[in-house]
Amino acid sequence: WFPANLCLSVNDCVVHWIPDKYVLKNWDVLKIDCGVNYNKWISDAAVSLVVWWELANPLGQALIVATKSALDRSLEYIHNWNSAYEYSRNVLTVMKNAWFSVLEKLTWHWVGNYVHEKPHIYNVPDSSMKKVQLKSWMVIALEPITAVKSRDFFCNEGNWRNLYTEYWDLWAQWEYTVLVTDDGYEILAGLETL
């Protein structure tokens, strides 16, 4: 059970911040993560942005652009019979080349009648992921979750929903719900332009 359809996480809060009375300020990095249940089928999508983009800090902008690029450039590895490892390996490579980190213990996942269906696949690859093969008609939520420096996170004040970067640095996320097809993929949900 989750208490909201919309999570609005700000600055160093990585995921799952439920909207409250916080007033956004110029230069805040905001992640909007939304799940939709339509006829008992779930879609999940997220986007990151900097409040007042034109005046924003260049570090936040660069992190967001790199994160979206990691997702978009890794989509070529989403196709029938490819392993989950290849997608995650490419996400990590793109982020390292941009001098940013990937939060190691957060995952992308299958979706269907529930928002987080198994298996959950880490954005940082390990050899066990080579056994997880993508197959046509699988629906997956691809979501690189990145940070300026942090690779880990913690729960603040015992609240399992609000996860914060280990160094209190900026983070970003971009997420698509994707259908695996015989010859590639189809994006079902998610903002494709920056």
Task: Identify the function of each model-found stretch.
Residues 1-194:
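Active-site neighborhoods and metal-handling regions in enzymes and metal-associated proteins
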